[in-house]
Every structure is written in C-alpha cells, then in structure tokens.
C-alpha cells in the first residue's frame, strides 16, 4: 500500500503532492522439479535474524552500487526504500527475500537499500536489468512509473511493483495486500484500550495524502467504533515513510494533544518508543519484530516470504502471469501481533474486556477463512465525519473504491471512492491540487 512518487500521484490524485535499452537479460535456468510455493511457516513467529548477503562491487547507478548476478542461478533482486534492517517495511521485504533463497531451489538474491523514488530508482531498475536479474521487486509506491518504463525495455525480465495500481499484464505486475483488514482489527483493540483507560481519544500518523493512507485510517476508525462508539481520532500528516525524528515528533504531538493510543502508517517503531516515555500506547506497523516495548499495544505486519516464493517458483516454471494481485488475510501474509498462532498477547491487550478480545478473535478467524475481506471492512452503512452517508446499508466497496480519490480523478473509475474521513475522525481532508 505504498510509497510516494509525485508523477504517479498526479495521475491518481489530481497532482496531489505533489533510455536506452540494455543488453538482453540472461534467461533463467530450467525450472526445478517443484514449482509449487513452499510451505508457509507459522505466520506468527518473528523471522530469525538474517545477515545481509554481500553485494559485489559494480558500477553505480545514482551513487548506488549494483550487485552482480550468479551465473546458472535464478537471480532475484529487491529495491528497498529504506534500510534493510529498519525494523519496519523494508526489513519485512528483506526477510521475505531471504525466505525465497532458503525455500526455492537454485535462487540467488540481492538487494539495494535506501533507493530514492524518481530518476535514481529508474537508473537502479535499468542497471539491475542490464546485469541480468530475472525477477526484480520494487517495494515503494514511487517506483511504479520508473519500473513500468524499464519493463518495456526488458520484456524477458519479470518486474513486480508493491502497492501502486499499474500492470502491463505481460512482464510488469502489481502486488499488494489488504492491510486494511489488520488495521480494522487494530482499531478494535485501540478503541477498547482507550475506553478502558477512560480517554476515548485516538491518533493516526499518516504518511502522504494518497488513497492508501485514507483507507487505512478509515479502517482503523471503523474498527475502533466497534468497541468504543464515543472514540474520536486526530490525524498528523508527516510526509515521509521513514524518518524516526519526524515520526517521534508526530507521535508526541498527538499524545500531547490528548491521544491515548496512536497508530503509525510509517516504517519505524518510533510511535511505541514515544508511548513508552509518555505512558500512552503505540501501534507499530509492517514488521513482526517491531513491538518490543511494554507500551506497544500491537503491530500489524507483513509476511512476504510465501508470496514472494510462489511468484519466484512460478516465474521459473513459466506459469506466473504478472497482473493485479491483491491478497487478503486468508493468504497468510498479514498478521496482527499477539493473535496469530503461537503468539502471546501484549500486556496492553491481555487485560481488555473479554468480549472485545473475543470480537477481535472471531473477526480474525473469519478473515483467515476468507469469509471476511477488505470489502467487508467497508460495508455499509458508513457515514463520514460530516454526517454524509458514504456507503448505504446493503452495499460495500469494490476494489476501485479503495484505490481512488474522488469520482472524476484521473486513473481508476470508482463509485464510492476514498476521499472521506469516517465518523469520529476530527481532522479535515487534505486538499486536492497543487
């Protein structure tokens, strides 16, 4: 659901926040006997610590060193927006990559971290392609258009873009998961915690004003209303995915303004550290191992390994067709810390009312069984924070409604769309335009 690139965002949100072909890529080796994705590990345990594979020195692209392939192997590279050990979004992808190496035969992996969106990323994707990588993963929203451009130049290489909304249905695919499922459940916990503490005020640290951030904030508020009808939520826009200082400042601002529980949409565990210092509660994001302090209520996390392995095995076997892949909780790739198999609830959750905890467990069970999806999170009746009916009773969202701002914006066609704040959110909508 993810990182920000100004040109791409202009196409989605009315200018909101605002090549030379290389030699042909080496062909992947013959498919191994087993083409099915490897068995998924327990989605509830933090992946074991891994050591970053060494990258062989090579000509730089935009000041970044490009790793080498290993001849005779299927070569997979990931381009990361932040450090591979950031304790959040990039680390979750990095550990998913190492899972591929361990579970799909004859695979070599590499990664490049701290790659800015824009021109530098296009150089990186082109350089990796010229090196001969067979599968290239781009893990930030703002890599979308650069990847699309490079994919046209190298038709024999498979490119997968995380988040975004584009695919050429040939060798450039789109992949994302319904984290709104887990944020909805986290909202239930946050509402219950705030109500029990006698302070029904929540906070949301939003990154960039894109549809993804509005839908996640709305999902969180809709969940909170299930356990705390009187709860309200303030919002701070931080305009970054990874900046521990900015994240701490925003968390402190929300907590000082009265928020009892604060959810982050950014990459680091900073919100929990601030909560620990202020005696409030923080909800971290992206990485299973990010909920380390006592005042971390839970974390909503990704488990990319099985999904990446399935894609890699499919590309090797020539059975994978890039397109639009948007997975729900039943994929096993989304988690709510403290509630998955083998996990223990945090101290901040364990003393909540039994009925609230059971509601979370029951809804999660439905999600894991495929009986409750991201579209059910946004089932009517839903009103916005001005009292306007957004979704009538008996209706629910479609995928385009999750991904698009108001009707008429360039890009997807939507009916209800995602340019509204749910009832209980006290912030104003970000303005469209320059």
Regions found by a protein language model. Name each.
Residues 1-8:
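Bacterial N-terminal signal peptides that target proteins for export
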Residues 15-20:
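C-terminal motif of bacterial Sec signal peptides marking the signal peptidase cleavage site
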Residues 36-434:
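A residue-level marker of the well-folded mature domains of exported/periplasmic proteins
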């Amino acid at each position: 659901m993810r990182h920000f690139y100004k040109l791409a965002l202009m196409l989605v949100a009315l200018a909101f926040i605002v090549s030379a072909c290389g030699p042909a890529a080496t062909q992947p080796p013959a498919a191994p006997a087993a083409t099915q994705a490897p068995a998924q590990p327990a989605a509830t345990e933090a992946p074991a610590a891994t050591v970053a594979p060494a990258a062989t020195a090579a000509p730089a692209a935009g000041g970044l060193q490009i790793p080498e392939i290993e001849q005779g192997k299927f070569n997979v590279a990931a381009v990361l927006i932040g450090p591979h050990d950031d304790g959040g979004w990039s680390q979750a992808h990095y550990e998913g990559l190492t899972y591929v190496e361990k579970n799909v035969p004859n695979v070599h992996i590499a990664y490049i971290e701290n790659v800015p969106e824009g021109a530098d990323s296009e150089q990186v994707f082109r350089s990796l392609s010229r090196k001969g990588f067979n599968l290239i993963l781009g893990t930030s929203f703002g890599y979308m258009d650069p990847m699309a451009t490079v994919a046209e130049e190298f038709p024999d290489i498979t490119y997968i873009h995380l988040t975004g909304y584009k695919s050429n249905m040939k060798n450039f695919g789109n992949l994302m998961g319904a984290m709104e499922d887990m944020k909805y459940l986290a909202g239930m916990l946050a509402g219950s915690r705030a109500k029990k503490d006698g302070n029904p005020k929540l906070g949301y640290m939003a990154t960039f004003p894109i549809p993804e951030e509005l839908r996640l904030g709305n999902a969180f508020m809709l969940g909170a209303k299930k356990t705390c009808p009187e709860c309200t939520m303030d919002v701070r826009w931080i305009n970054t995915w990874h900046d521990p200082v900015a994240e701490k400042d925003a968390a402190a601002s929300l907590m000082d303004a009265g928020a009892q529980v604060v959810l982050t949409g950014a990459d680091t565990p900073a919100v929990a550290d601030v909560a620990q210092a202020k005696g409030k509660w923080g909800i971290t994001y992206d990485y299973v191992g990010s909920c380390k302090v006592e005042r971390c209520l839970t974390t909503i996390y990704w488990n990319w390994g099985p999904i990446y392995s399935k894609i890699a095995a499919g590309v090797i076997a020539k059975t994978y067709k890039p397109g639009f892949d948007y997975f729900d909780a039943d994929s096993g790739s989304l988690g709510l810390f403290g509630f998955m198999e083998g996990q223990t609830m945090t101290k901040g959750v364990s003393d909540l009312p039994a009925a609230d905890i059971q509601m979370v467990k029951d809804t999660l069970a439905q999600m894991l069984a495929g009986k409750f999806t991201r579209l059910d999170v946004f089932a009517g009746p839903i009103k916005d924070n001005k009292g306007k009916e957004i979704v009538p009773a008996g209706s629910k969202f479609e995928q385009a409604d999750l991904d698009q701002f108001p009707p008429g914006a360039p890009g997807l066609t939507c009916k209800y769309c995602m340019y509204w704040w749910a009832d209980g959110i006290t912030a104003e909508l970000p303005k469209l335009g320059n």
